[in-house]
Amino acid sequence: GWTQKAGWTWRAPFGKLAQDNEPAVHLTFDEAQQMCRFQGKRLPKDHEWVKAAYLEQRDQPPTGFQKGQRYTYPNGQSAQKSHCLNGCGNYQGTAPQGALWRGVGHVRVMTTPPGVNGLFDMGGNVWEWVDTGQGSEKMTRGGSWWYDADRQIESDVATKPRDTRVGYIGFRCVQDQ
């Protein structure tokens, strides 16, 4: 089973002090939600996260993306260039040269190319808490460096107890307009 390691926190993922440009990990659902609220934001609902990750909405997207198209992966039609354990193209279980400054785990935000809607790291890198789920179980989306590319597809949904605190789950905040 899992064991908690001394010194492994959101301030020090894998026991090494975090940098400002890293995803925040080792946070429970409630802690992530509190961090978003502190910034006047919130965790996205599942349908919001899915729309942002898979449905291109930009009026003039760059080459490789088409407005109104729903993509298989947050990076487009493949998981190429996302950061995951297997099936992410030229990364093959590793990040770009020099990106894994700890030697293991997630990479700094915006290390991989932008995907659907110009968003970074929606597929791979770290699972993201979404504000959907019943009771003590909450959903995560997007897959992570710890999982294969097939965990990044829209139909793949993971749930975890809301008090889960691990190095491969993070979050992103959204703001109502």
Where are each of the predicted segments found?
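Functional-site microenvironments in short loops/helix caps that host divalent-cation chemistry
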Residues: 1-158, 167
